Amino acid sequence: MLMNVRLCGCFILLLLISTFISISLLNSQIFASTTKPLVGVNLLGYYTATPQSREIKSILPENYYDESFRLISQAGMNHIRYVFYWESYVKDPIAFMNELLFVANSADKYGLKVIYDNHQFHTSSWLNPQRGTGFPNFLFQNDTHYQYGSGGGPKYPAAAAWWQKWWNRGIRDSNGTDGWTLQAQFLKNIVKSLDSHPSTLGYEFLSEPQIHSVDEWTKINKYNTFMVDALRTVTKKDLIISMTIPVDLKSPIGVTSENLAKMIPSNQTGIVFKFSLYGLPSANSYQEQRLNIFVNTGKIAHVPIYIGEWNNVAREPSVNEEGDTVYEIDPKASDITPEDTSLILKKFSEFDIYGWAFWYWNFRPHKVDNFNLVTLDENGNLIPTKYYNILKNAIVSAYK
């Protein structure tokens, strides 16, 4: 009789445990299906975005971060992709780190989730003193192949030569230390300072690197594997791997889902694939074709996808110094309407995405109007533009 009672008690206990697990799983499934993804903006700072080869005359507005994070939160956003540059750290490491820590503390205060993006645009201010920012000057100035001002975009021979050598792990400083090792050391210091903050979600260790030949896909995998292994010694948080540029679907480089997936390391734990979208992904359009390639990359590689930059721009052909035709953003023709914004967010909802970040949030005015979510009044106060309100309203409609 006593044994029967015990057996009955064990059965009831197992039933209760099973029911609890089932309810927990159901709740997690419901939560996953109804919770909006990361929804946010790219945000630029001051000392963390200062190039070595030119002076920035603008002044950081008082309460810039507090006001920005308040406005971002009020617009229904929960995320920031914080853009920083390696060369900015080299220029002023103390101011750089102080600003990063201030960002982390402010994000903690507002409950925002931050991905810290080691950004580069046109490789470096060494190669493009007018517009470029990214890698520090010491990786260029000791080699006559990379003359100052010789061009950092994908169409320039100096940039192509530098990136090809970078993927071969041949770029070195004056002491003979290779660039991969130096970059890993820099990023590990960043991670050690930020990782304990609850607002820190992860790190993008190199945004939109250049690729110049079809054999570089596997070389980029070696680089990504090296960086992931190095950063995994100091963090368990998400690591974001970026798409490459140029994204020309007709080029011999082979911009396909299969090749893009080759960049992803075999250890996929906590890895996210990031890409950018600067156009309307309308049905049967070139932008939709690009988007589908990126989405399929995530499926092949078995990693989440993250739209780390998006907006809508118009491009016009021009001829660069080498006589090549390049497509540059046309500021006057570029714009994004409420209908455009809703269309893009609706398209994003068709996929299981990690999140997205609109390009962008910056107190410095940009010549492309729809790149300005805020502006400054004569007293240095942040004033939301019409594009802030367009984005805010679209978020409310998309994530009711």
Can you annotate each of these PLM segments?
Residues 357-363:
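Acidic carboxylate-rich catalytic motifs and surrounding loops in phosphoryl-/glycosyl-chemistry enzymes
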Residues 57, 61-62, 173-353, 372-376, ...:
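Extracellular glycoside hydrolase catalytic/binding regions
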Residues 2-13:
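N-terminal Sec-pathway targeting helices
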Residues 35-257:
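Active-site mouth of glycoside hydrolases
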Residues 377, 381-400:
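Aromatic- and carboxylate-lined catalytic core of secreted/periplasmic carbohydrate-active enzymes
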Residues 367-369:
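Catalytic histidine-centered segment of alpha/beta-hydrolase-like enzymes
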Residues 18-29:
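C-terminal segment of classical bacterial N-terminal signal peptides
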